[in-house]
């Protein structure tokens, strides 16, 4: 009996089981589009980054000039740079939407997939941070100085660790060189972790909006969801194109158009918008070590939901109080993002502290409230 080559060829059948004949729930919504959109973002970032690296010079005397050269004299260099810079913003926007969907619909119950997703988030943050340093503008230099200096808060080994990261006694040429090397190699680690993420997801099967087992009623991924993903790609590329062609510097800090100067500190040092909520959490604790611990906890706490989940049903749609708290978490995240871009003064300090507390309260109290709801204590 004849079998299609996609089911028999050793290499093609791997692609087939991932993108063509994959059994998928028949009720997944647009919120399940962001995984494939993140794959698209990763490909865009790797390709544009590869071409940019051909013209970039990782040297403190020439880095800023080489970025200016890319923008002015390299054929379509301005386009590559804008796509790469704004593509990072789109990447993080989709990460937050993807993770938010996972929290809302209980996807963290697929613990291996969720934990690798959190590791992917950490790798992406490290990659983006080091990429932000490479243009060697004022905000690049001072951002690198401030963030790497946080490691000095670690007792006993802090000072040694910071100097080891810097490759000297300050952020200098050695720092820029190693950041460029890691910024180039980490996306390939992200690709490897992505393959593991997909592998574990397909081992257990995708979650769905109602959180029930959908094994009895699945449909092939192609053509149903491949068409749906193509629509997502079209909309995402259109949005990115509008940003790149009309407002390429919307998210760029004006300070970064000035070459790095260790003798002049910017009035307000801040990271890119997608790190502002973490920066607000860091600043909300009036102690260096405490702030670093809060920052670390804000990310590591994402490993907690698979361990603390006691819900009888997966989706928060069935838990009105938890659903209200979830949207409170989203509001807290948005307000912390705003606070991270504000000066360190009242009333921004107290607002940051309040919403930092609310951020952590969600993860601590959500399992208890869902358990009480299941036990019918709350009616």
From Swiss-Prot:
The keyword Heme is assigned to this record: yes
Cofactor(s) this protein cannot do without: heme b
MF-aspect GO terms: metal ion binding; ubiquinol-cytochrome-c reductase activity
GO BP annotations listed: mitochondrial electron transport, ubiquinol to cytochrome c
Location of the protein in the cell: Mitochondrion inner membrane
Cofactor note: Binds 2 heme b groups non-covalently.
Topology in the lipid bilayer: Multi-pass membrane protein
Residue sites binding a ubiquinone per the record: 202
Binding-site residues, heme b b562: 84, 183
CDD domains: cytochrome_b_C (cd00290), Cytochrome_b_N (cd00284)
Keywords linked to the UniProt accession: Electron transport, Heme, Iron, Membrane, Metal-binding, Mitochondrion, Mitochondrion inner membrane, Respiratory chain, Transmembrane, Transmembrane helix, Transport, Ubiquinone
Positions with a binding annotation for heme b b566: 98, 197
Note: Heme 1 (or BL or b562) is low-potential and absorbs at about 562 nm, and heme 2 (or BH or b566) is high-potential and absorbs at about 566 nm.
Family, per entry: Belongs to the cytochrome b family.
Function as written in the Swiss-Prot or TrEMBL entry: Component of the ubiquinol-cytochrome c reductase complex (complex III or cytochrome b-c1 complex) that is part of the mitochondrial respiratory chain. The b-c1 complex mediates electron transfer from ubiquinol to cytochrome c. Contributes to the generation of a proton gradient across the mitochondrial membrane that is then used for ATP synthesis.
Assembly description: The main subunits of complex b-c1 are: cytochrome b, cytochrome c1 and the Rieske protein.
Protein name stated in the entry: Cytochrome b
Species for this entry: Lumbricus terrestris (Common earthworm)
Higher taxonomy: Eukaryota, Metazoa, Spiralia, Lophotrochozoa, Annelida
């Amino acid at each position: 009996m004849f079998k299609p080559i996609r089911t028999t060829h050793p290499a093609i059948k791997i692609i087939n089981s991932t993108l063509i004949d994959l059994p998928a729930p028949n009720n997944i919504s647009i919120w399940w589009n962001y995984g494939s959109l993140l794959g698209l973002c990763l490909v865009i970032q790797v390709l544009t980054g590869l071409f940019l690296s051909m013209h970039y010079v990782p040297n403190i005397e020439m880095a800023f000039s080489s970025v200016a050269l890319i923008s002015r004299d390299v054929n379509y260099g301005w386009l590559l740079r804008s796509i790469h810079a704004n593509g990072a913003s789109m990447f993080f926007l989709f990460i937050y939407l993807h993770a938010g969907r996972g929290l809302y619909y209980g996807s963290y119950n697929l613990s291996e997939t969720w934990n690798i997703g959190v590791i992917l988030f950490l790798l992406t943050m490290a990659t983006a941070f080091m990429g932000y340093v490479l243009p060697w503008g004022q905000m690049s230099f001072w951002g690198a100085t401030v963030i790497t200096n946080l490691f000095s808060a670690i007792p006993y080994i802090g000072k040694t660790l910071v100097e080891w990261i810097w490759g000297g006694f300050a952020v200098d040429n050695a720092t820029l060189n190693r950041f460029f090397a890691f910024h180039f190699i980490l996306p390939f680690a992200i690709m490897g972790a992505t393959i593991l993420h997909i592998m574990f997801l397909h081992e257990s099967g995708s979650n769905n909006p109602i959180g029930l087992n959908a094994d009895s009623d699945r449909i092939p991924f192609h053509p149903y969801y491949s068409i749906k993903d193509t629509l997502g790609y079209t909309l995402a590329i259109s949005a990115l194109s509008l940003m790149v062609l009309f407002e390429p510097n919307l998210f760029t800090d004006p300070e970064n158009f000035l070459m790095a100067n260790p003798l002049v500190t910017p009035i307000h040092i801040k990271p890119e918008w997608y790190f502002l909520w973490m920066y607000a959490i860091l600043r909300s604790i009036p102690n260096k070590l405490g702030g670093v611990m809060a920052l670390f906890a804000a990310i590591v706490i994402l490993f907690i939901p698979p361990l603390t989940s006691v819900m009888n049903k997966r989706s928060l749609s069935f838990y009105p109080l938890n659903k209200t708290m979830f949207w409170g978490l989203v509001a807290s995240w948005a307000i912390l993002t705003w606070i991270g871009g504000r000066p360190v003064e009242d009333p921004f300090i107290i607002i940051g502290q309040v919403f930092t507390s609310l951020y952590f309260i969600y993860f601590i109290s959500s399992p208890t409230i869902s358990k009480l709801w299941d036990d019918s204590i709350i009616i």
